[in-house]
């Protein structure tokens, strides 16, 4: 195995990332840098991630140019990078290999005990919980996560052990490059359908192929409560462990209750001689499901139950996953501020349910930025139904994520549809900074203010706190 690593390093020591500023790309880049590869990258955006990589010693360019790759032996591209990118064109001219992010991740995983977490929703939180438990168990894993761990402030780390924990991204089907030892499938939902020719069966088939990449002695941990997962269970031909709230699952959560910002429940698993009480430092039934998946992985690694319990009780979460930013003082109104990455109707519904169960007597004021024209079009009716359950709704313009506009698909159209189907009267604003002038006339004392979306709406919490605390 060491000989194979040396061959790879001798031939591919200089690695250049096009689009290095994303969480997935930066995580792989950081691990490779810490393995003493020469890492460079380009990204038109400067952010905390690129600043961190630069401080570590990576060469970062904030403009795409063919000269950026003059020393590169391999080019790694994110799914957002198109074939007409100047650096990609030059690489092809020079016969420099151009590989997708997941193929480089697969190469890292090939030399380790890989644990890959797949699913339309919940990947980042599940990956983070598994990582946290292994850290508490002093197993020192390598991890690459699509979000920032609140406990450490980072999304990737090179560990000393053979364990590598990573998210498996189905959005471009690149997760099929991965060959882990253990895997999780949290759910299968209608999203990124352009990749799958708008055919839901193609999406399900991809998850079946993903599970087939496991060795015959591996295991796939799957959420049997999810309809999409249930539909492929009989097509999985690897050792299988199911989890959920329903009877008949291998790992089952029972006796669920919420106290403040924590969830309490018991776990039934035939590997345990008795029910195991869990205190989870997160809210929401969706996070209980994420936790059950993590427990399934950790049982396969023979981590003791007392360590799992301890880790879950002090897990501090992931950035932009129901982040609580304290209270804002807006015209003497005390408003609790939450921020979440949710951008799919089912994710939004889970966040709404969690907050409404926690703050049953308070209004939910929601600021949402739709993400991608195609997703807004494909899930339009679901967005209308889900967003209509907010008490107050403010919509930002759709964040395009490099997509071209689609006729009649915009936030105003979405707002009009919500007005027709409910008593809600959404407000549409063009610029996130306009929120500062809008909020004082909207919020009441003790409202819950929720920021939602995967685009540049992430700037809002700091903007609001700098003006209203």
From Swiss-Prot:
What is this protein's name? UDP-N-acetylmuramate--L-alanine ligase
Family classification: Belongs to the MurCDEF family.
InterPro entries assigned: Mur-like_cat_sf, Mur_ligase_C, Mur_ligase_C_dom_sf, Mur_ligase_cen, Mur_ligase_N, MurCDEF_pg_biosynth, UDP-N-AcMur_Ala_ligase_MurC
Pfam family for this entry, one: Mur_ligase_M
One cellular component term (GO) for this entry is: cytoplasm
Q: In which pathway does it act?
A: Cell wall biogenesis; peptidoglycan biosynthesis
Enzyme class per UniProt: ligase
- List the NCBIfam families hit by this protein, alphabetically: murC
Its source organism is Ruthia magnifica subsp. Calyptogena magnifica
Q: Which residues bind ATP?
A: 119-125
The entry's keywords: ATP-binding, Cell cycle, Cell division, Cell shape, Cell wall biogenesis/degradation, Cytoplasm, Ligase, Nucleotide-binding, Peptidoglycan synthesis
Q: Where in the cell is it found?
A: Cytoplasm
The residues that cross the membrane are none
Which reaction(s) are listed as its catalytic activity?
UDP-N-acetyl-alpha-D-muramate + L-alanine + ATP = UDP-N-acetyl-alpha-D-muramoyl-L-alanine + ADP + phosphate + H(+)
Gene3D superfamilies in UniProt? Mur ligase, C-terminal domain, Mur-like, catalytic domain, NAD(P)-binding Rossmann-like Domain
